[in-house]
Structures are given as structure tokens and as C-alpha cells.
Amino acid sequence: MNHQYIPSPIYSDQNSGVHNVNKSLHNLNINNGNNNYNYSNNNYNNNINNNNNINNNINNNNNNNNNNNNNNINQYHQNHYDQYSDNNCNNSNSNNINNNNNINNNINNNNINNNNNNINSNNNNNNNNNNNNNNNLLKIPQLNISPNGVGGGNGISNGNGVNKIFSKLDLSKVPNSYQLAHNSSMPNSPTSSNISPSTPTSMALNLSSLKSILDSPPAAPAHSASSSHNNDHRTLNINGNHHNNNNNINNNINNNVNNNINNGNGNGNGNGNNNNNNNIGVNGSGSSNSSSPSIGFSIPLLQLKQIGINNQTSPSQQSQQQQQQQQQQQQSQHNGIPLINTTEIHQRSNPSSATNSPRALYYGNESSVENSPFTTPLSSPRGPISPRATINSSMSNLQSNIRVEEQWKKIEYYVNDLSHFIYESIRNKDYSNLSELKEKIDEVVNTSKEIEIIHSIAKSLPPQTRARKKRSTKAEKLQKDLIGIKRSYVTTPKSKGTYCIFCGTMETPEWRKGPGGHKTLCNACGLHYAKNIKKENQNNGGSPNPQQNNVTTTTTTTTSTSTNSPNSNGNNFSPESAMSVSKLISD
């Protein structure tokens, strides 16, 4: 069978004999359900050929045809993915990729050297007597410890359930400014001092082992001797069987100084004989087939270190703590990691540090805000208005009001002085000065008595305003109106014999000219008479009324006749003249 060389980011350096991984490798996703090896990188510029690099060379010279299992190793390319395809890739008797999804790779002598960041992986199999196994080597990227650290995941492990890839990771060379990832489903894991190749290396640390890690000096960040970029951030995301097990664990390996150890959403299964779980990561043993992800949170260790027995922090430490907290919040928002604000925990755990005032010590920790006794509130709740306040509001004496206001200001001063004296006595814990206390209380009492005296004097004073005028009744109003009307009339005594020739009234404001001459008609009748004469003159075109002429003639005759008679009255008219005048007035 011809060898098929697959372009891959995994390569082997022939000169050094050390298997290195492309610096741009970011994500290694092993999907156990589909047996897909997904390699995600940014730049694949390595031309892998037979002469220069040996890229996961699967030698099939001594393959057993009975072990053909038709497994497809597909590497696909979408945006940042390249697709690899190799059908019927069967190794010799040692490495079997079978339908049970078991990848049993015994990887021994895994030394992680922080000086050159090279991982020497020698794949030695006891069941393999063929030299072709040297061509099928699992290439692991150089582990530059990152803020997210090395966490548990689903991937490749040996058949005994122990992952030996990261088993010799020395945590003493990892800077101690990382985040602790806590998962309720993870047991108490060993510290950096007792990690051995036979121990499952669960990187979740318990709180009892923090002190030994925090007290150790931070080591310098690892730098690769073969890397040309010191700040090259490389990330290895190892995801387990996402479709079957729902346990996704992201192991972010970067080159930052602040290194975080993160546990993701569950623990992988390190049993090599399990059909659904093939582990690459820290958790090399155990089984987690639960479909519900566990809830994880991270606590900054630098803040936990500052929480001592006495919980006392200086202002400089508080400022550094706030800066570190802001940086960690920004980093957690970038990585999607929830953080716990330990500043609030510190304040809650030390309530006595909130205030050290004597009032708080005397009354208890009720409030950390102290109000000065000299500050008067703008508005204070008032009770019901007393009758005395009602009398004071109705009092119109301006001078007494001014005196009352002065007394109230005086009593306000005395009360504030008394409260200040009590406050200082409690703060200084001096409770023996009773004479001064009594003196200040007497000042307040005497001022209140003066205010009462002023109120009593103001009440006894007569009002300075006039009494309100009494309202007259309706009958009185009518009588006053009648009196006023009568006074406006001009009365004429009946002895004179003057009266209106039309209505017969003897009282009128003014006598008017009528057909009998001057002052023969009352005011009302004279107005009607003059108005009707004007209308008749207008209707007749300016010619005099014949009736008027007749009336005038008759009046003249009667007057001349009456003048001759001794018993005649000047105001006596004939019936005809009276009818004519009444007709004019009535019209």
C-alpha cells in the first residue's frame, strides 16, 4: 500500500530528534462520536514531505489486513480549518484505532522542560516489535502556561485511565498569580509537591494547599528556545465528546505571566476502554458520563492571600487590590469566567472595620454614617398641630411674633449645645460631669418657659384690627333703600295744590312742562309727553298736530274764561283737554 502523506500542523524535527508542534496551533478538537481529528490553526505554512518532515507517518508495511476498521480521520477546513482525509489508516499491532473509539497510546517519559518548552514524547509499546511505530508519534504542543492554565478535559489517555502527558508538570515553576478554578464535582486534588506520574493530576487545588503555593516565589515565565516570538500566545483547546457526553473542557495554554488553572464544564473519562471518552488533559482517571455541566467559579488567589486572620488591609494594598480586581474582571469578561468580588467578602467578614466611632461602639454597628449634632435637617417630621400653635398662627401682633422667633432660635442653640455635649461625653466615655449636663438642660427648660409666657401675653392683648361690620338683614336693606329713595325725591306740600294733571301725584323729583304749561306734569309723565310730541311732529312732516292745536286753543279759551271767573283754578282743565293729554302720554 502506498503511503499517503497528510498535510498537518504536527511535524517532527529530524535534526534535533525532538518532536515540536507548530507555533500557530490553537485548537485540537477530538470528537469521539465521529472519530474526527480537527486541527485549527492560523497559518499552515509547513510543507510536509517525505524528505524534510515526518508528519504523523502511519507505516502500513506490516499491517494486518484483519485489523482494517475503515475509520476516517478527517481534517476539514472552514474559515480556519484544513481538512485531512485518510481512509483505512491502520497502524501495526500496537496502535489500534477501532470502532469502539478506544485510543490506547502508552506515552511514557513525558518530560516538560520549562527552559526550552520541548516535549519529548517517545511512544514505546510493549506489544509492538516493529520499528514502524516510531513514525506514528503523538505530537503535543509546547506548554507555555497561560492565564487559563492547564485544565481537565476529554481526550487521549492510556488504558489504565491515567494521563501521563501532564503527570510530571511541576507547579513550583508556575507563577502563583493564577486563578483557582473550583468545581463541586472534583475531589481534593494533590498539590504541586506530591504530584507523581501515577497520580491523577487534577489541577483544581483545595484551599488548604494555597499557602504553600502562594509563599513560593514566582518563577519566570517559560520561553521556548526554538520560538522566534517571545510573546507568541498559543492556545490548545481540547474538547471531549461534545455530542455524546456534553462535557466540554477548554484548556487554554498561553504565554502570559498571570497563569490561571481553569476547570471547564465537567471532568473527562480517562478510561481507555470506554467507548465515549478519550482524554487528553489533566484528569486522567475517573468517569463522568453526566450530560449536565457542572457549575464552576474562580477566585483570585492574590485576593485570597490578602484575606488573613485579622483581615486588615492598608490603603496601598487596597489600591493594588482594586487594580488587580479590575484587570481580572476585564480578563474574565474576555474569557467568559465569572469572578467573585472578594472585596465585598472582606468587608462582610470584617464588619468591625466599617466604623470605629464611639457611637458605633456604644450603640452597636448600626450605621457607618455619623451625623453631626450641629447639622439641623431642612425638613423634619412634625406631629399634629397643637391648639397653642393654632393660636400662635392666628396672632397678628408682629412684635410678639418676632420675640417668639428669637426664643425659638435660642432654644435651638441650647438643644444643639446639649446634644453636642452628650455626644462628646459618650465618645470620651466621661459620664461624671453631671453639673454641666443639668445646667444645659435648665437652659432648654427656661427658654421653653419664656416662650410660654410670650404666648400668654400675646393672647391677653386686645386685637389691633377693627371688628368686622355686621351684616344687615334683607328687611333692613330694603328699608335703607326706601329711605334713600325718599330722600332723593322733592316733596311738595299739598297745601300748595300742585299735582300732576295726568297721574295726580304730588311728589316728583322734578316737575315738567305739560299741555297746561310749566310744572303741570310729573317727571315721568312729562318725559312721555315730550317724546310723543316729537314723534307726532316727525310723522306729520313738521306740521303741528291738529289735536294739539285744538288742545292749545281749548286750553287758551278755558284759561281766559277761568281768568274772568273768580272761583276758577289755574290748573283746572276741561274733560276734552284731559282726554287729549292722556292720549298723548299713553301713546
Curated annotation (Swiss-Prot):
A zinc finger (GATA-type) spans 500-525. Residues 53-74, 87-136, 183-202, 237-264, 272-292, 316-333, 538-575 have a biased composition (Low complexity). Keywords: Metal-binding, Zinc, Zinc-finger. One of its GO terms (biological process) is chemotaxis to folate. Residues 53-141, 179-294, 312-392, 536-587 are annotated as: Disordered. Residues 75-86, 340-358, 365-379, 577-587 have a biased composition (Polar residues). The keyword Zinc-finger applies. GO terms for cellular component: cytoplasm; nucleus. SMART domains: ZnF_GATA (SM00401). Gene3D superfamilies: Erythroid Transcription Factor GATA-1, subunit A. SUPFAM superfamilies: Glucocorticoid receptor-like (DNA-binding domain). Coiled coil: none annotated. InterPro entries: GATA_TF (IPR051140), Znf_GATA (IPR000679), Znf_NHR/GATA (IPR013088). It comes from the Eukaryota. GO terms for molecular function: DNA-binding transcription factor activity; transcription cis-regulatory region binding; zinc ion binding. This is GATA zinc finger domain-containing protein 3. The gene is gtaC.
